[in-house]
């Protein structure tokens, strides 16, 4: 296909596709799917080889969130039967993190539900970061605490945080359809505060809320303009007890097209396969490794993930290798840009995801049972499919009608182990 040849050439030069080209990727047929994966795989290997970065989530505070994000199992009014607990002590969080590190994770993502941290919360998390770093030499720590107030990003950076995650979730145009308690602009501002403080920014999306192809392209191009170092891609976990419980809009093929499109738009950025991969990609997960260069190991915030050893076996069987602790995740040009300051960018590459380098930071873009690391601690995606307080199943006018995937509620399991419990974690 001429389209794919063009996209590969652009990706190898760190040049973004046009919006029309990105839309065309999402519109490819199932017969063309393996060609799409192969093309995006060339771009992935150019910048990341066959390495896969492992990240590990620690849910510091679960449930009881005052925000009304429709996709999130921790939202205000959620009837999902998830674990609910207040802040873990620093030593408890450090023990949980150690399990992930022992399993091969080079980054620990600390997540807390809520609109955003108080100054006291930042002090608490700072102590947790220090405890984790003291026990695990060389480990990266990403914080995901919601909307930040002035000075909080600087304090987290001073405590040793390497990165901060806050997902855009969806396009600005449709953001009001998924939450009413904060705005798209609030999210953008928090990512920019993290960047200004010298933290590696992580910001991504959620697919599967009934969005159109245009919606997906809009949010990915917005992310490119925002220029995070890591872009986590979540797939909605339709948790019973949330407004989107009936939204089973994804197929494995659709998920692969979305991941390929993100890779073409953000060729040299850490693209992370985040929450919902087990539910929607299922046996097609190994193919996704040709598109992404980062995954979460083990469980998510409020939902169970694939067994940690199964993740490791999948990576090896697909011919990839776990990225070592001493390896810089992102290409040299992006790493050099980050070390030179957040504003350092390569003018030849344009702005956005293809230009400014990451310290290797990934981000917490995984949903904890239904959402990402946004204020609600779930997976940060947008959903034009339903307004924040509507019943599940109400469609937003103009949303693309995608062939629905089968409702695999058997694959959605609440996390009952690890952080906040007495049971050993999955890592």
UniProtKB/Swiss-Prot annotation:
Residues 47-277 form the Radical SAM core domain. [4Fe-4S] cluster binds at residues 65, 69, 72. Residues 383-427 are annotated as: Disordered. It holds the Pfam family BATS. Its EC number is 2.8.1.6. [2Fe-2S] cluster binds at residues 109, 142, 202, 272. Keywords: 2Fe-2S, 4Fe-4S, Biotin biosynthesis, Iron, Iron-sulfur, Metal-binding, S-adenosyl-L-methionine, Transferase. InterPro entries: Aldolase_TIM, BATS_dom, Biotin_synth/BioAB, Elp3/MiaA/NifB-like_rSAM, rSAM. Pathway: Cofactor biosynthesis; biotin biosynthesis; biotin from 7,8-diaminononanoate: step 2/2. Binds 1 [4Fe-4S] cluster. The cluster is coordinated with 3 cysteines and an exchangeable S-adenosyl-L-methionine. Binds 1 [2Fe-2S] cluster. The cluster is coordinated with 3 cysteines and 1 arginine. The keyword Oxidoreductase does not apply. PROSITE patterns: RADICAL_SAM. It is an enzyme of class 2 (transferase). Its cofactor is [4Fe-4S] cluster; [2Fe-2S] cluster. Catalyzes the conversion of dethiobiotin (DTB) to biotin by the insertion of a sulfur atom into dethiobiotin via a radical-based mechanism. This is Biotin synthase. It comes from Streptomyces griseus subsp. griseus (strain JCM 4626 / CBS 651.72 / NBRC 13350 / KCC S-0626 / ISP 5235). The gene is bioB.
């Amino acid at each position: 296909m001429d389209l794919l040849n063009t996209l590969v050439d652009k990706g190898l030069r760190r040049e973004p596709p046009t919006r029309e080209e990105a839309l065309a990727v999402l519109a490819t047929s199932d017969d063309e799917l393996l060609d799409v994966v192969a093309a995006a795989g060339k771009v992935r290997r150019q910048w990341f080889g066959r390495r896969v970065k492992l990240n590990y989530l620690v849910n510091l505070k679960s449930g009881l969130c005052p925000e009304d994000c429709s996709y999130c199992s921790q939202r205000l009014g959620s009837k999902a039967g998830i674990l609910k607990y207040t802040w873990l002590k620093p030593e408890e969080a450090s023990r949980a993190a150690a399990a992930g590190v022992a399993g091969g994770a080079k980054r620990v993502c600390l997540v807390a539900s809520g609109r955003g941290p108080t100054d006291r919360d930042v002090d608490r998390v700072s102590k947790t970061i220090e405890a984790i770093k003291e026990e695990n030499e060389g480990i990266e720590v990403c914080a995901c605490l919601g909307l930040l107030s002035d000075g909080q990003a600087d304090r987290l950076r001073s405590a040793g945080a390497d990165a901060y995650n806050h997902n855009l979730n969806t396009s600005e145009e449709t953001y009001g359809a998924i939450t009413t308690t904060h705005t798209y602009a609030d999210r953008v501002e928090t990512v920019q505060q993290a960047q200004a403080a010298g933290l590696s920014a992580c910001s991504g999306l959620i697919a599967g809320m009934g969005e159109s192809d245009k919606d997906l392209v809009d949010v990915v191009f917005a992310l490119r303009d925002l220029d995070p170092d890591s872009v986590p891609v979540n797939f909605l976990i339709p948790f019973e007890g949330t407004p989107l419980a009936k939204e089973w809009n994804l197929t494995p093929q659709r998920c692969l097209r979305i991941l390929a499109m993100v890779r073409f738009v953000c060729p040299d950025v850490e693209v992370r396969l985040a929450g919902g991969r087990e539910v929607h990609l299922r046996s097609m997960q190994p193919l996704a490794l040709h598109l992404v260069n980062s995954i979460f190991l083990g469980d998510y915030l409020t939902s169970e993930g694939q067994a940690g050893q199964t993740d490791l076996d999948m990576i090896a069987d697909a011919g990839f290798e776990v990225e070592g602790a001493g390896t810089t995740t992102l290409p040299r040009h992006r790493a050099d840009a980050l070390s030179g300051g957040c504003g350092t960018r390569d003018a030849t590459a344009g702005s956005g995801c293809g230009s400014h380098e990451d310290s290797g930071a990934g981000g917490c873009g995984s949903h904890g049972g239904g959402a990402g690391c946004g204020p609600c601690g779930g997976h940060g995606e947008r959903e034009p499919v339903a307004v924040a307080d509507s019943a599940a199943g109400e469609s937003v006018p103009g949303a693309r009608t995608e062939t629905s995937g089968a409702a695999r509620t058997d694959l959605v399991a609440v996390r009952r182990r690890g952080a906040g419990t007495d049971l050993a974690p999955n890592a």
